Design a protein with these regions (language model features):
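Preference for long, amphipathic alpha-helical scaffolds in soluble/luminal domains
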Residues: 1-151
């Protein structure tokens, strides 16, 4: 299993360090890998890895709130507290993202997904409700971490 883990990490870091396309979901998943490896003080995490992770986060972060209703990753998709090592990289977009969230919470007190399934069916409506719950819990945890709400 260790060898498989190293192979996966090597593949992820090869993409991270390259100039190949590395989209928002790829970057978010690699960021989660880097975060976990940092927690165990892995020698796989080098300054070059951290620098490339910063580059990918910035490449995939939208700072224009006019686009937030579209399918874009915001600063708070990559940073969930001010203790994140990537906080300084995106901090200039944090408050505007909070403002957007508060301006766009719906009458039920939850947030709608910024995407659609392209169909209207019982299943798509149920999945949409599930996503509302996921988004709301995730955002509530972030708001709590930034002392923007009280529990």
């Amino acid at each position: 299993q260790r060898e498989l883990g190293y192979k996966i990490a090597d593949d992820c870091f090869a993409l991270l360090l390259s100039n190949d396309f590395c989209g928002d979901h790829d970057s978010l998943n690699i960021q989660a890998l880097v975060h976990q490896l940092l927690q165990i003080n892995s020698p796989l995490i080098t300054n070059e890895i951290l620098s490339s992770m910063r580059r990918r986060i910035l490449d995939n972060t939208c700072f224009d709130t006019n686009n937030y209703n579209g399918y874009y990753f915001t600063p708070l998709d990559f940073v969930s507290s001010s203790s994140s090592i990537w906080y300084d990289d995106v901090k200039h977009g944090i408050e505007q993202t909070f403002d957007f969230w508060f301006d766009n919470i719906n009458e039920q007190g939850v947030w709608n997904p910024n995407f659609s399934w392209g169909i209207d069916s019982d299943v798509s409506r149920q999945v949409n409700e599930n996503w509302k719950g996921y988004i709301t819990v995730k955002r509530a945890k972030i708001l709590l971490a930034f002392d923007r709400i009280e529990f």
